């Protein structure tokens, strides 16, 4: 896409372009040659940089692609202090990332995301690292170091990206090795003992034939949560990683790129501050003489007698091969193998009581993927890409829960018989549950095969038509077991024995085993039409169909709960505009969409098995229909050589159309509710991102720079049932940076403040031990620090 001057915009100035859509229209009747355009912009410093993307599996300018997307270059990530994938939402209003823990990481785009805490459900946003799909969303929690660019594609992307992209896809592309020597180093220090080190070096190993690149990072920070039980600090940071690459170019028609990765994390995380206590919890706590902390979701304090240690280890290898064939077509092979392990030992009750003495979770994910693609532009009217895809995944899971000496008295503390017969905690034998061990073991294997193709027919110089299809065949098989051990004989009288056995059965369950399998096929596709009204204005309309795989419920379920669930399918209609104005100094994109979701996957309640047990949310089924509607606006403007402005706004109306068996708020005393017409959880109505960057040149080739970023989200519920304490109020965050650097950015010294005004906010909600109890993950407080960077 090229740029031309629009007299009306120049006359009235850039503020109107951000406040009115009129800058998108106008009669661009005069056609300029390349030389004319060069004369029209004598100062290239005033022109926004061109952005190249690979969203359609080929390199092309972002403004010519009929897909709603956000693109962030690696330098933009560094400037904004975006170091982790979950921080991308600072610049992408339609993206919401919830990270209660790596195991339960959830990405949502336009209000649609993963709907439950269950190892058997897949994500709705596909995350791809150097072309390799990451099978579990917790695998995507990587440090964004040495990144070429990040592409966030909004809306279903099933044709080229496959299953589990019903809400969108995130492409992470690392920088490739270079033959010219280059490198960078970065040191950051800040409050709470923050120490962050990042470094990269690249260069030729065999001149013109073999190049290498090595990247590493080390991050440490003290905890943000005060544990009132022993004075320790929780929710710290401690992670390290390495990425090594080789690029082999033995000829002009062949290249091979090998990437090896290692990432380690060992932190006291997965810690939640209480936001609501149910009446049951208050009665039980009072019975055993335990004083709960006052409700204050922003206090960043807990009271628990066990650590929350979470360790993850991820290793991976990617091999990308590219052949330029005699016909001019390019054949690409991407092979990927990844291992990911999650090992958690945590306080299962969130209190300083010996209710759950030990709670452990061990997950091991192994996956292999292979993609073959053939891409070509045989003539000026046709571009195409066709391919084959294979993905194999293997998940092992081991979960253990051991009850402590306070468990029996606590769980019986709200029974009416306690007061009726004047029972005290000392009268309840701890042996009823103490030492009882639940072990949940399981395994899931899945295989996915697909064939796909997409072509773009340039019917005229301005009109392009892009159809695409993908056929996917999916098979999953799994087994799950529960065993109970560690219980001593009760040795009680007959009546007490019966009551004790009932309590044990309710709290621990019995032996359990099941094996399930599913096999399904799906046809995804799209049809897009784009029209270039002139060189600066592209309009498009598209229909797309996405697919999220069905699966197997990897929780223990009762006889009334289906062990498997069907695939979730999304049909989306979208119209949009992509424009440039003011001789290339500004860009403004607009998208309007509606998506209809069929067989929406969610967890619902099953009725209680007896009067001791509350409703259990383990019924993972297809509940009905969801509709998403919204408008998105993205704008960038180079106001002068010194000032850049940006603005992103997203309005989303995400609602259940049909959800009759939804879990109710625990305070309602109902087992199921009809949520038809209600808003989805984790789906704020309004989201926005805005920012300004300022540069001021000094003598001796130096430059002062500053940046201000603002992010806003309106309030929304963080859980499906919307219980008291699960609402996340609206908030706005401001980040500021000030610094000095060389004009060529060979070195930089920067002072920064994140969450400048120390705003209280919530990033995730979690259902705690008791029905109706909620904990929240509060956002980080204000943090001030300094970063030094050098490049060569």
Name each model-derived stretch.
Residues 320-326, 330-346, 532-548, 555, ...:
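Membrane-embedded beta-barrel scaffold of Gram-negative outer-membrane proteins
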Residues 384-385, 461-465, 594-596, 621-720, ...:
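Gram-negative outer-membrane beta-barrel transporters
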Residues 37-180, 575:
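Acidic, small-polar-rich N-terminal luminal/periplasmic segments of exported/outer-membrane proteins
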Residues 122-124, 136, 145-154, 159-228, ...:
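Outer-membrane beta-barrel translocator/receptor signature
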Residues 171, 178-180, 188, 200-304, ...:
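Periplasmic-side early beta-strands and strand-to-turn transitions of outer-membrane beta-barrels
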Residues 225-233, 270-303, 347-358, 400-441, ...:
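Solvent-exposed loop segments that connect transmembrane elements
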Residues 1-82, 86-92, 252-253, 317, ...:
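N-terminal Sec signal peptide and the immediately downstream disordered periplasmic leader
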Residues 596, 711-719, 740-792:
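C-terminal beta-signal and adjacent terminal beta-strands/loops
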């Amino acid at each position: 896409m090229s740029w031309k001057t629009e007299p009306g915009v120049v006359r009235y100035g850039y503020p109107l372009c951000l406040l009115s859509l009129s800058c998108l229209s106008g009669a661009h009747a005069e056609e300029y040659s390349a030389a004319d355009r060069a004369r029209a912009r004598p100062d290239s410093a005033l022109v926004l940089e061109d952005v190249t993307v690979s969203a359609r599996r080929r390199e092309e300018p972002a403004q010519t692609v009929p897909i709603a997307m956000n693109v962030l270059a690696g330098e933009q990530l560094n400037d904004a202090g975006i170091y982790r994938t979950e921080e991308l939402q600072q610049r992408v209003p339609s993206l919401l990332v919830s990270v209660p823990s790596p195991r339960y990481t959830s990405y949502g785009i336009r209000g649609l995301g993963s709907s439950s805490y269950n190892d058997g459900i897949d994500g709705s946003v596909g995350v791809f690292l150097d072309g390799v799909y990451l099978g579990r969303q917790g695998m995507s929690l990587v440090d964004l170091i040495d990144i070429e660019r990040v592409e966030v594609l909004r809306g279903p992307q099933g044709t080229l990206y496959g299953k589990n992209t019903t809400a969108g896809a995130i492409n992470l592309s690392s920088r490739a090795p270079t033959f010219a020597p280059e490198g960078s180093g970065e040191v950051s220090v800040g409050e709470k003992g923050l120490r962050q080190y990042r470094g990269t070096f690249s260069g030729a190993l065999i001149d013109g034939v073999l190049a290498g690149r090595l990247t590493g990072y080390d991050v440490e920070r003290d905890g943000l949560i005060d544990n009132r039980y022993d004075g320790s600090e929780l929710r710290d940071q401690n992670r390290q990683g390495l990425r090594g690459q080789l690029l082999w170019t033995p000829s002009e028609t062949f290249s091979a790129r090998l990437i090896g990765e290692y990432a380690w994390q060992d932190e006291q995380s997965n810690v939640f501050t209480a936001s609501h206590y149910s009446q049951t919890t208050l009665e039980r706590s009072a019975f055993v003489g335990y004083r709960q902390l006052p409700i204050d979701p922003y206090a960043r304090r807990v009271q628990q007698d066990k650590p929350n240690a979470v360790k993850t280890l991820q290793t991976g290898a990617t091999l990308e091969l590219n052949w330029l064939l005699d016909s001019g077509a390019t054949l690409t092979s991407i092979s990927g193998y990844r291992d990911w392990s999650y090992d958690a030992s945590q306080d299962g009750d969130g209190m300083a009581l010996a209710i759950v003495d030990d709670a452990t979770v061990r997950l091991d994910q192994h996956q292999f993927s292979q993609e073959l693609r053939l891409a070509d532009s045989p003539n000026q009217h046709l571009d195409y890409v066709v391919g084959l895809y294979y993905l194999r995944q293997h998940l092992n899971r081991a979960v253990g829960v051991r009850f402590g000496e306070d468990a029996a008295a606590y769980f019986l503390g709200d029974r009416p018989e306690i007061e009726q017969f004047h029972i005290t905690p000392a009268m309840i034998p701890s042996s009823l549950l103490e030492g009882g061990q639940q072990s949940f073991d399981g395994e899931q294997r899945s295989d996915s095969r697909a064939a796909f193709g997409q072509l773009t027919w340039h019917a005229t110089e301005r009109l392009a038509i892009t159809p695409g299809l993908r056929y996917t065949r999916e098979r999953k098989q799994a087994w799950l077991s529960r065993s109970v051990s560690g219980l001593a004989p009760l040795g009680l009288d007959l009546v007490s024995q019966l009551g004790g056995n009932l309590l044990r059965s309710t709290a621990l369950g019995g032996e359990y085993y099941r094996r399930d399998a599913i096999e399904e096929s799906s046809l995804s596709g799209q049809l897009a039409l784009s029209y270039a009204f002139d060189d600066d204005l592209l309009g498009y309309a598209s229909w797309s169909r996405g697919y999220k795989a069905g699966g197997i419920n990897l929780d223990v379920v009762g006889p009334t709960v289906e062990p498997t669930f069907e695939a979730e399918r999304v049909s989306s209609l979208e119209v949009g505009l992509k424009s440039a104005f003011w001789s290339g100094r500004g860009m403004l994109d607009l998208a309007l969409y509606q998506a209809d979701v069929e067989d929406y996957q969610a967890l619902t309640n099953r009725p209680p098995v007896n009067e001791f047990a509350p409703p259990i949310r383990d019924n993972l089924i297809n509940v009905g229909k969801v509709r998403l509607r919204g408008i998105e606006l993205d704008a960038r403007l180079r106001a002068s050589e010194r000032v850049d402005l940006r603005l992103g706004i997203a309005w989303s109306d995400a609602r259940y159309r049909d959800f009759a068996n939804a879990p109710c708020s625990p305070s309602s005393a109902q087992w199921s509710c009809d949520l038809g017409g209600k808003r989805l959880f984790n789906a704020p109505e309004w989201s926005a991102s805005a920012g300004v960057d300022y540069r001021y040149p000094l003598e001796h080739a130096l430059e002062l720079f500053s940046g201000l970023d603002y992010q806003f989200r309106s309030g929304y519920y963080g859980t499906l049932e919307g219980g008291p304490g699960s609402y996340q109020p609206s908030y706005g965050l401001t980040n500021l940076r000030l610094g000095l650097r060389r004009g060529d950015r060979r070195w930089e010294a920067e002072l920064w403040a994140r969450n400048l005004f120390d705003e209280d906010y919530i990033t995730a909600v979690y259902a705690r031990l008791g029905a109706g109890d909620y904990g929240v993950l509060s956002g980080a407080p204000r943090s001030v620090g300094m970063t030094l960077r050098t490049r060569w």
